[in-house]
């Protein structure tokens, strides 16, 4: 896909087909690939689209590119479907064909979208089950700022895929298994022994402190260390008391995680690492059957193809340690098999997406290669890692508290809302506006959380990004408050008497600002298709920001409520479609909108 979103995906597909047919008619015996190379026009003065396919044909056809372009245009002009869609094509430069959509076709499309709750975005014809694996915090540890990116990027991608009509299984692969549970269960048995006899739930207070205490005892006390190791064996062996303690720890963590998810409006199905325990031996058997398994220093490994260590030898993916234990790679392979496996013994997915930090890229590349070579990825299915960079402080270093600790997600969200509230109260004072406490709390909560989400999603996820409350809460620039304010501005038109629900007959546009807004609005479907394919939410953010800017220029430069009667309905229609597009687009980012701020 081009970096500039195409004007209407359906238009672009129609034009592409018309151009191919015209090229075929112009050069029926050409021994060359006939590709129109259709792309959105790089500048408005070049029209809506540019077809650059004449240039690469010059050599095989032994003709000048402009001559080739002229022959293609003659065939286009003989196609009534094309002439109904476009104005007369212009040949520019060495042989570019510039194409402009007829204004009446654009106006008709705006009308169609006004009556379409999907705003011109079609549902996929062949919906496929998709697994999106995101968030995935560890039990007995609080969610920190590092979980923020996976959680909100994964949620946004899931929303876009759901909107397109796919059945999406949102999976939370929580870290609920492993040797650390030995020390946690031992500590729990010693500090809250009664809980194991009676309680269905236990309140351990600050989970981070509980984890730290257990870790300190494990590091300092050999007897505690020894008991912890025995506890791991008991847990893996299914000892009922150990399982009860493990369950209590998982439940408390789950309750804490859910508070964050509720606050961020995140839906997830928990399926922790422990779910795959029964399937781990079958992973080893499957790799053995595929003749991929090699014993190396007592461990069972698969050596990767095309990936060497510093010594020049192939790197191994260890799937069973020399003591017989399994590891993350084994669990991830079991998860891949299950997710692609046919129902009822699997999820039957056709696309599996992992949203984790870029530091895990090599791990997943290795695991994916092993799964591919073992034959566990069905033909035509897609297995993708969606990596993201670090959240940094304004000093460019990893974001930490003043004390040097990891920033807890709960604290970060609290501060965002508090700062949004301070900004709002200050603005109300300046404007001498009086609002209810309920209004202030609702706006501050919405703006604060929107700012945090949007600041993250608007960055290219692959890069690190610097976290700044001042930047993300600013009313100017590519921020959530700027976009939310555009929605508020349009809601204000209705409050001032503009009927945004007015039944519009044939829309009439004359001003360049109107046409700029029309063209921007009609890019929405191609942007959604791009995000679905490339899994980059920042493309949607960039589009919504550009749309807000184009709308603000239109609203500032062209009268709306004071427009002439014949222009009023059409301009109100543009306002309504802009608000609908912003609301839907922000909703797909997991961001709620407001009618007043």
From Swiss-Prot:
Catalytic activity: tRNA(Arg) + L-arginine + ATP = L-arginyl-tRNA(Arg) + AMP + diphosphate
Protein's UniProt keywords contain Nucleotide-binding: yes
Main location: cytoplasm
Subcellular location: Cytoplasm
GO cellular component terms, A-Z: cytoplasm
EC number: 6.1.1.19
Record keywords: Aminoacyl-tRNA synthetase, ATP-binding, Cytoplasm, Ligase, Nucleotide-binding, Protein biosynthesis
UniProt short sequence motif 'HIGH' region, positions renumbered to this chain: 137-147
CDD domains to which the protein is assigned, alphabetical: ArgRS_core
Gene Ontology MF term list: arginine-tRNA ligase activity; ATP binding
Gene Ontology BP terms: arginyl-tRNA aminoacylation
Keyword Lyase: no
Source species, domain of life: Bacteria
Alphabetized InterPro entries for the sequence: aa-tRNA-synth_I_CS, Arg-tRNA-ligase, Arg-tRNA-synth_N, Arg-tRNA-synth_N_sf, ArgRS_core, DALR_anticod-bd, Rossmann-like_a/b/a_fold, tRNAsynth_Ia_anticodon-bd
Pfam family, one: Arg_tRNA_synt_N
Subunit annotation: Monomer.
Record family assignment: Belongs to the class-I aminoacyl-tRNA synthetase family.
Protein name as annotated: Arginine--tRNA ligase
